[in-house]
A protein has these predicted regions:
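Structured-RNA-binding interfaces characteristic of tRNA pseudouridine synthases
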Residues: 1-261
Length: 261
């Protein structure tokens, strides 16, 4: 049978999602826990790979197994073997046609940014940080240039393995509460470091170092060297994929309510 799981994790302690020889990735920890619970090896596929230091509020994975357990047992049993900064939120049986990556209609991320003259303390590692004020309207105007289908080569890491740099951004929203900014992104898919590179450019515009129209110049250049430096992973959260409602999978986890705004 095929199962889908939703899980959340604090990415600070891990070298990203994808399995590595070190074993210090979220995928490695999850597969070890699943194998311990099911008493057999299990290989997972995820909806979206996250980089080192990036957090997940609702990563979705699927796997095939002959082990029969109640769905609630898959949640509680797997969590028993997981470290405290990773937790399975739900489990659901799906048909063999479901694919955590291939069935996703879009993917959603949020970036939480602290604007303060003093560096983060209690939220260190969970938020990005700027000490110069940001101008919201300028950032909104800059973000508008990125909406729709474009070649995002200028925002692509050199190590990116995507077959095409052409992606479609469906939504970018910017909001602020107190000292905290929240940037939401939704696209059909994202390139390696794409959001962190966009964040670097938005901050350059927000602080007045560049004009809003500079974002279009960066986009059209199709050259990573013309964009701002890659911003910190600390405040980046994978909110999860969107699927067709017919799959019956949750779109939220309780961790959503923890994020500001």
């Amino acid at each position: 049978m095929r199962l889908a799981l939703g899980l959340s994790y604090d990415g600070r302690a891990y070298q990203g999602w994808q399995s590595q020889a070190t074993g210090l990735t979220v995928q490695d920890k999850l597969e070890a826990a699943l194998a311990a619970f099911a008493n057999s090896p299990i290989s997972t596929l995820c909806a979206g790979r996250t980089d080192a230091g990036v957090h997940g509020l609702m990563q979705v994975v699927h796997f095939d197994t002959d082990t029969v357990r109640d769905l609630s047992s898959w949640v509680r049993g797997t969590n028993r073997y997981l470290p405290s900064n990773i937790a399975v939120q739900w489990a659901k049986e799906v048909t063999s046609e479901f694919h955590s990556r291939g069935s996703a209609l879009s993917r959603r991320y949020a970036y939480i940014l602290l604007e303060s003259p003093v560096r983060p303390s209690i939220d260190a590692g969970r938020v990005g940080w700027v000490f110069r004020p940001l101008e919201e309207q300028a950032m909104r105007q800059a973000a508008d240039h990125l909406m729709g289908e474009h070649d995002f080569t200028s925002f692509r890491a050199s190590a990116c393995q995507a077959l095409s740099p052409v992606k479609t951004i469906k939504r970018i929203s910017i909001a602020k509460r107190g000292a905290y900014w929240r940037f939401d992104f939704e696209a059909n898919a994202f390139l390696h470091h794409m959001i962190r590179n966009i964040m670097g450019c938005l901050i350059a515009v927000g602080q007045g170092a560049q004009s809003p129209d500079w974002m279009r110049e960066v986009l059209m250049a199709r050259n990573r060297k013309v964009a701002a430096p890659t911003f910190s992973p600390d405040g980046l959260y994978f909110l999860g994929p969107r699927y067709d409602a017919n799959w019956g999978l949750p779109e939220r986890s309780p961790a959503y309510d923890w994020l500001p705004l």
